[in-house]
Design a protein with these regions (language model features):
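C-terminal beta-strand-rich structural cap/linker in extracellular carbohydrate-active enzymes
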Residues: 605-646, 666-667, 675-693
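Glycan-recognition surfaces
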Residues: 317-362, 396-503, 522-530
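Carbohydrate-recognition beta-sandwich/jelly-roll modules
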Residues: 25-263, 285-288, 306
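Carbohydrate-binding surface patches
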Residues: 483-486, 491, 530-590, 621-629, ...
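Bacterial Sec-dependent N-terminal signal peptides
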Residues: 1-25
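Aromatic-lined carbohydrate-binding/catalytic grooves of carbohydrate-active enzymes
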Residues: 225-388
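Solvent-exposed beta-hairpin/edge-strand motifs
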Residues: 79-92, 574-599, 669-681
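Alpha-helix-loop-beta-strand connector modules within alpha/beta enzyme cores
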Residues: 292-299, 389-409
Length: 693
């Protein structure tokens, strides 16, 4: 029987199974093309994930066969109970991996071969799983967890393939004409007894190895100030049908609404293009005859203070047109490949293009950029030379230039390895497929994907849960609460005349500042390895809020009428989940108070679970607040994230001093000499308050 060995410890030999490099390159990308079972040089040795050495979590190939652009390895997996495969969905005739767009989806399985079945019960608003993916989470038979992720080298990219028989293959390739060389990174994997630490440990290792990433932890990044405030985006209201007059009229309507929207994000529809290729950085002259000047004049410090603009990383959806108006020195840093102009081929030329690109937007007066279509930049280069290096340089140049010019950056359609692993400065990335008004199944899928993907993305960025409609009669208020607990940007896309203030004001203070959690919401342990659209069970997420609270939302995301009503719960032990986010969960509390936000009621949790009935597509928000020295601080009851509305300055057995961040009704729980009381204190002005028992 073939011996299974650790990949880094042995000389590697292989079986030739690839057409020569001089033949037509198999990686030239086009819509509908898949890379399943792509021709590769098959390595004899097996990557054995049973052998875990914490000190060497990144596996490297030390002996790369000559003249090979693509290698493949069999992957030996430990005994497992169930898992998640992270890949996009696969639609015949549609774009495929590595163009993951916003479609890195969590596919649940008991056995890997489940994912290959035509009757796989997946996500109703999406197609079947792609066999090609970027990450894998396993719950092991011994109770531990294993997380494995594909990685990029200087000019290589790895990916996983789930095979029909349930086996797993790892590929690594240049995705082009050149051969693999040097010390070749293959994958990263970590094991842990904690389902949360297995992700954070893997990212600690990834960040530490500068050969395979350009990353910092989310907590170490600066969060762009505009994203602390409520915004509005044109996309879901208009899609491509925007122009200067409409935007100016909407700014008038926003200001008249009384809702303190502080930034406007102008989405797609303004770009000068030919056949979906960029022709100019000047906006479409028919739609914007005055350029951006009239719109920029509407910025005011106490109203709409910031303006953001949508663009594509590659120019426009299909790259850059040869028929462009760029200065000669900029044209010289572009090269023609496969029907498009692209930045390159050198790192210096790519930096020059993005310096021009970002500087132009800065000079127009924009404060931040939403850069979309990022995962399609790699396919535009595929089949050529230095594919990975050039595509990666595009992401890095964007990071360098927006940081240097102090421009905010929202990353969108940025869910392949090159995008995810090179957010050096930017702190926001879209976590899911678009939200659509009135589409219940899509909303459920959106929530499931957003929260689960945050286990990965949330290590290095805040998750952008996409814009939403406050007027959505299916889930407007539910979506507002999910945006609040996400911690990411919150931006509306209603027609301003349709704003529903009751769904918006609980998100913000009087200036439009969002009450945010201390870390982004992720699923509770029992919810991570289940598909809540099919499970017949409730789905729960949590985030640390304020100085010491934990907020929990319980959902019914089931799509089957058989599970229209499900039961959920909160319990004392949930509070300890704060520790998994890197925040303190001091066990010195006397007890845990559960505040039901919808019912505005509170109860002390005992040893048993507090049961909750969820009927239909609904949610239930709780704040778990520790009782210390006879006090539990809930916060302003009118705001979704009540604990985030106050800062605890001092607490004794007789006195509590708080800094309250907004007006409203302050809820405080007290226990004095056996008398328990849930107090309501009107706050007419934000600031310091002293409360005595």
């Amino acid at each position: 029987m073939k011996r299974i060995i650790h990949i880094c410890l042995w000389l590697l030999t292989g079986i030739f199974a690839e057409v020569s490099l001089s033949a037509q390159n198999p990686f030239i990308y086009h819509k509908g093309k898949t890379y399943k079972d792509v021709a590769a040089y098959r390595m004899e040795e097996i990557i054995d994930l049973n052998t875990h050495t914490p000190s060497t979590p990144i596996l490297y190939e030390q002996q790369v066969p000559e003249h090979q652009s693509t290698l493949s390895y069999k992957v030996a997996l430990p005994l497992y109970v169930r898992g998640i495969f992270f890949s996009r969905d696969s639609r015949p005739g549609d774009y495929q991996w590595p163009n993951n767009t916003n479609r890195l989806l969590p596919w649940m399985f008991n056995r890997l071969e489940d994912l290959t079945r035509s009757d796989y019960a997946g996500i109703p608003s999406n197609a079947l799983p792609s066999a090609s993916g970027d990450a894998l989470l396993l719950e092991l038979a011994d109770g531990e967890y294993l997380f494995a992720k594909a990685i990029a080298g200087s000019n290589s990219l790895s990916w996983f393939q789930v095979n029909q028989d349930g086996t797993l293959t790892l590929y690594v390739s240049t995705l082009g004409e050149d051969a693999l060389t040097g010390r070749l990174p293959l994958l990263i994997f970590r094991k842990s007894s904690s389902i949360y630490h297995v992700f954070s440990d893997a990212y600690d290792s990834l960040i530490a190895d500068k050969a395979i990433s350009a990353l910092r932890k989310r907590a170490d990044k600066e969060y762009f100030n505009a994203f602390n405030y409520l915004g509005w985006c044109t996309w879901e209201h208009y899609h491509y049908d925007i122009d200067e007059t409409k935007i100016l009229n909407d700014i008038d309507a926003i200001e008249a609404s009384g809702i303190p929207v502080r930034y406007v994000l102008i989405d797609d529809g303004h770009i000068a293009n030919k056949n979906r290729q960029l022709t100019s950085l000047v906006p479409d002259k028919k739609r914007f005859p005055n350029g951006w000047s009239r719109i920029m004049k509407r910025k005011q410090a106490d109203k709409i203070r910031w303006m953001g603009l949508w663009y594509s990383l590659s120019g426009y959806w299909m790259g850059i047109s040869a028929e462009n108006d760029f200065p000669l020195e900029i044209r010289q840093v572009l090269h023609s490949y496969n029907g498009s102009l692209l930045p390159g081929t050198s790192t210096e030329k790519i930096e020059t293009w993005y310096e021009y690109y970002v500087r132009t937007m800065k000079e127009y007066g924009f404060d931040f950029l939403k850069i979309d279509n990022q995962s399609f930049t790699l396919p535009l280069y595929m089949g050529g030379t230095q594919v990975i290096r050039q595509a990666k340089d595009c992401n890095l140049a964007l990071e360098h230039q927006t940081h240097r010019m102090q421009m905010g950056l929202m990353n969108c359609m940025a869910q392949n390895v090159l995008n995810i692993d090179h957010t050096l400065y930017s702190s926001v990335t879209r976590a899911s497929i678009d939200y659509k008004k009135y589409d219940e199944n899509m909303a459920k899928s959106h929530l499931f994907q957003s929260y689960t993907n945050t286990l990965i993305l949330g290590q290095t960025v805040w998750p952008d849960h996409d814009m939403f409609h406050s007027c959505d009669t299916v889930c407007g208020s539910l979506m507002a609460r999910s945006k609040a607990i996400s911690g990411g940007p919150v931006y509306l896309s209603d027609s301003p005349g349709e704003f529903i203030a009751d769904n918006i004001r609980p998100l913000i203070d009087e200036t439009g500042k969002i009450f945010r959690p201390a870390a982004p919401a992720v699923p509770t342990p029992e919810s991570i390895l289940t598909n809540p659209l099919q499970s017949g069970k409730a789905y729960r997420v949590f985030a640390p809020t304020g100085d010491e609270a934990l907020s929990v939302i319980c959902y019914n995301l089931n799509t089957s009428p058989a599970y229209r009503e499900v039961e959920s719960f909160v319990k004392q032990e949930d509070y300890l989940l704060r520790e998994s986010t890197g925040k303190s969960a001091d066990s010195s509390s006397d007890n845990i108070l559960a505040f039901n936000w919808e019912k505005q009621s509170a109860e002390v949790l005992n040893a048993s679970e507090r049961k909750i009935k969820l009927s239909g597509f609904t949610d239930s928000l709780f704040h778990l607040c520790p009782i210390r020295k006879g006090w539990a601080v809930i916060g302003i009851q009118e705001k979704y994230l009540s604990p985030a509305t106050v800062q605890i300055l001092k607490r004794t057995t007789e006195k509590l001093i708080l800094d309250v961040h907004c007006t409203g009704t302050l809820r405080i729980w007290t226990d004095s000499h056996g008398k328990q009381e849930l107090r309501s204190i009107p706050i007419k002005k934000a600031g310091k308050i002293e409360i005595k028992k």
